[in-house]
Amino acid sequence: MQIWVDADACPKVIKEILYRAAERTGVLLTLVANQPLFPPRSLWIKTLQVPPGFDVADNEIVRRLATGDLVVTADIPLAAEVIACGGHALNPRGEFYSTENIRELLNLRDFMDTLRSSGVQTGGPAALTQADRQVFANRLDQFLARIVSD
């Protein structure tokens, strides 16, 4: 099992939580982005730079994903592909995507895209709060504790 990160849009504070978790648990963490990344040096942390382009990083994550891997992403279509491939998907606010909620989230995303394309100002997501960071760290720790103990 390893952790994949859709790193282009992943907040720095979430990456820092992931770095610490990889070091603590010995679980391989791979950050995938279309720009250079400079994580701390570690046996457990790798980067994978992909060419620029629409969904190139997402496609590379899905291509390399193994059943049971964890993907950290806010990209709902990527999360849907991860779930379909037998992986786990967690967003930076600590919410797991699942077979039970992914369809509704995709529909909501498509609806918001339709609103935006018709000129409605929908705004973006709120900034991550300290509580969001704590929820993410707790859910990640719970997930890794289950995986590492198995």
Swiss-Prot record:
Pfam families: DUF188 (PF02639). InterPro entries: UPF0178. HAMAP family: UPF0178. Belongs to the UPF0178 family. This is UPF0178 protein AZOSEA36080.
